[in-house]
A protein has these predicted regions:
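Short glycine-/polar-rich loops that comprise or flank the Walker A/P-loop
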Residues: 1, 66, 95-99, 164-168
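Interdomain helical connector at the RecA1-RecA2 junction of SF1/SF2 helicase-like NTPases
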Residues: 1-66, 83, 87
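Conserved helicase motor "Helicase C" RecA-like lobe of SF1/SF2 P-loop NTPases
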Residues: 75-119, 154-158
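Secondary-structure transition/capping motifs at alpha-helix termini
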Residues: 58-61, 88-97, 145-146, 163
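Conserved RecA-like ASCE P-loop NTPase motor core of nucleic-acid helicases/translocases
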Residues: 65-75
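Conserved motor-coupling elements within RecA-like helicase/translocase cores
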Residues: 97, 103-149
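Well-ordered alpha-helical segments embedded in enzymatic catalytic cores
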Residues: 43-54, 135-139, 152-156
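A short beta-strand element within the Helicase C-terminal
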Residues: 149-153, 157-168
């Protein structure tokens, strides 16, 4: 029989698991699971694909090709992941006319408990090192130029940001 487990094995496994069963706070567990899902590479790469393709198809041609978009993320770690996935996707697709900048405060560091973070652990991410094309310019001015079409933000520029080219 395929995929067969006898009662004796099931009983032993159940006994081992029951002895290690610990109660957790349901709210904390939900927060952790949601954080894991939001930061997972596959989830972010799929969202980035939709964002870029939507921008390319529906937004990019507005305002005589000058249209801009802003993507608001729920955390600084998420903003870093979106920027990395965004850059990877546009490179893979050969899209040279779509570039993103990322805006967040301070430094972002990943740890071993973050999903798919092994390649990111030990690195410090800042606006400066994630936006090499700023070339000393202030972010608002750089975003107004032709160098950037999409701004990925976390806890920044969400209110009071006046960019007339912002269409999406």
């Amino acid at each position: 029989l395929k995929n067969y487990t006898n009662y004796k094995v099931v009983y032993k496994l159940t006994q081992k698991l029951a002895s290690k069963d610990h109660e957790v706070d349901a709210k904390k567990a939900k927060v952790k699971v949601n954080q894991w899902v939001r930061l997972h590479d596959h989830n972010i790469s799929q969202k980035v694909k939709v964002i870029i393709e939507h921008f390319k198809k529906n937004v990019m041609g507005l305002l005589g090709g000058q249209a801009k978009a802003m993507v608001v993320t729920s955390s600084r770690k998420e903003a870093v992941r979106y920027k990395l996935a965004f850059d990877k996707y546009v490179t893979e697709q050969g899209y040279q006319s779509i570039q993103a900048m990322v805006a967040f405060s301070g430094e972002v560091e990943f740890n071993d408990s973050d999903p798919n973070s092994s390649a990111l652990v030990g690195q410090k991410f800042t606006e400066h090192n994630m936006n090499p094309n700023l070339k000393g310019r202030e972010m608002r001015k750089a975003f107004d130029s032709d160098d950037y079409q999409v701004m990925l933000v976390a806890n920044k520029f969400q209110t009071g940001f006046d960019q007339p080219k912002l269409c999406a």
